[in-house]
A protein has these predicted regions:
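Conserved glycine-rich cofactor-binding loop
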Residues: 10, 15-19
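Active-site loop immediately N-terminal to the catalytic Tyr-X3-Lys motif
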Residues: 104-105, 152-158
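Substrate-binding pocket helix/loop in short-chain dehydrogenase/reductase
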Residues: 102-104, 108-116
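The beta1-alpha1 cofactor-binding region of Rossmann-like NAD(H)/NADP(H)-dependent oxidoreductases
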Residues: 42, 65-76, 109
Length: 165
């Protein structure tokens, strides 16, 4: 048995249409999981899902767009994931935002609130939406992607540093 056998696992990954999230989705699918590709733009999500499905010659990746700043879209993401792949065994919160670079002294409070909402609050909402099923099944995993910013501060990424700690 392989340490990385994800056969029959269903994984919801936010921020998975490109970058690290896309790589996570591909690796999970390659190891047998069904994956949900999610980010704000449907066309990019679909493109990533097609790319993964083509590389693996199997329909294992599905696109469901969601903006992590919108609570209703988060709820819809979880509901549509369940409709598409039946269950959620693993939630990977990868999506994040940083709309401001500069000194915290110059950061408008609206930008600070956006970072905290998108990088912390949205993860809490998603966890609350999937945890009851995981508790009921006595199985499941939640992974929240951090960043080097959590341990190495930056004078121009203050709020982002806080949100990743």
């Amino acid at each position: 048995m392989s340490l990385f056998n994800l056969k029959n696992k269903s994984i919801l990954i936010t921020g998975s249409s490109k970058g690290i999230g896309k790589a996570i989705a591909y690796q999970c699918a390659e190891h047998g999981a069904k994956v949900i590709i999610s980010s704000r733009k449907l066309d990019i999500c679909e493109q990533t899902a097609v790319e993964i499905n083509t590389k693996l010659d199997s329909e294992v990746a599905y696109a469901i767009p969601a903006n992590i700043s919108d609570d209703d879209q988060l709820e819809n993401l979880v509901n549509e994931t369940r409709k598409k792949i039946g269950k959620i065994d693993v939630l990977i919160c990868n999506a994040a935002t940083n709309p401001f670079m500069g000194s915290m002294l110059d950061m408008p409070i609206e930008k600070f609130d956006k970072v905290m909402h998108n990088n912390i609050r949205s993860n809490q909402i998603l966890c609350n939406l999937v945890l009851p099923e995981m508790i009921s099944n006595e199985d499941g995993s939640i992974i929240i992607i951090s960043s080097i910013a959590a341990i190495k501060g930056s004078p121009i990424l203050g709020a982002y540093n806080i949100s990743k700690a």
